Amino acid sequence: MARPMGKLPSNTRKCAQCAMAEALLEIAGQTINQKDLGRSGRMTRTDNDTWDLASSVGATATMIATARALASRAENPLINDPFAEPLVRAVGIDLFTRLASGELRLEDIGDHATGGRWMIDNIAIRTKFYDDFFGDATTAGIRQVVILAAGLDTRAYRLPWPPGTVVYEIDQPAVIKFKTRALANLNAEPNAERHAVAVDLRNDWPTALKNAGFDPARPTAFSAEGLLSYLPPQGQDRLLDAITALSAPDSRLATQSPLVLDLAEEDEKKMRMKSAAEAWRERGFDLDLTELIYFDQRNDVADYLAGSGWQVTTSTGKELFAAQGLPPFEDDHITRFADRRYISAVLK
């Protein structure tokens, strides 16, 4: 049985920045409107909650963009997202604007420097994994791309897509509208034919996608970056089933498998997230991720896809770090989180 959620132990309080790192890994860009917050400031997930990019959970997409801005400015960066910082500024959340611009350092939020370095490296690794996935897919001849829960993803604008590539971005209407307008204000032009599909993934998004021009007879590269932890177990299965139903042979899918935690690990993770929430609250940003993530036991993503006819390849975060020559980390919590599997699959 998990211990009660009481006062945070001192070692947990000291690692607020590690908690921020963990929190960033869980965020997929999904957001829920401020109007759904109760008087306590906590979020209660409902079947019809909505989201934008400027309030409450909407800020999670901005948090990931902030991390990409930091990773892009790192010494010898693995990624380059020139739109990350200006998009963060456009959203206007003070904490993230100051972090993205360099005015505020991660060390100013928490006192665990290793956690901050790992967070930046991890977001770089994660971003590069999906960038490389799309590069490999187009090299194999795929010219139809679907980015699920796109948030502030700018791959349609920053990746060198081959001629004839069509990119479909799916997210909430407010998210799609904001990003499209903000990038237009930056005079940014997509490098592929971009179609923004404004639909909730809990609704009939396959029909909306096809109505936008998607051709299920063509091989497609799908991405579900950081998304699955924000879906209940049955929602995860429905999403994967829908992707399979839309996929022609040789289609590809990239995603991440949520960590399987025992009760003690789950309780510890929640406490660390609350520690991060306390640190953020001191900076004027109020968000408790424990109210957003589904910790329920669920089907193993790799096994589920394999059972649906996909040929699955997995890599752990540790393996991706090693492949880039990045140093390992000794913090137990970070090491555990680096066990998360990155999944690339091809439908046969």
From Swiss-Prot:
Q: Which InterPro entries match?
A: Ppm1/Ppm2/Tcmp, SAM-dependent_MTases_sf, SAM_mthyl_Trfase_ML2640-like
Output one GO MF annotation. methyltransferase activity
Q: Which UniProt keywords apply?
A: Methyltransferase, S-adenosyl-L-methionine, Transferase
Q: Which GO terms describe its biological process?
A: methylation
Q: Which domain of life is it from?
A: Bacteria
Q: Is the keyword Methyltransferase in the record?
A: yes
Could you tell me the EC number(s) of this protein?
Answer: 2.1.1.-
Top EC group: transferase
Q: Which Pfam families match?
A: LCM
For whether the record's keyword set contains Disulfide bond, the answer is: no
* Residues bound to S-adenosyl-L-methionine: D171, D200, L201
Query: Matching PANTHER family, A to Z?
Result: S-ADENOSYL-L-METHIONINE-DEPENDENT METHYLTRANSFERASE YKTD-RELATED, S-ADENOSYL-L-METHIONINE-DEPENDENT METHYLTRANSFERASES SUPERFAMILY PROTEIN
What protein does this entry describe?
Answer: Putative S-adenosyl-L-methionine-dependent methyltransferase Mb3432
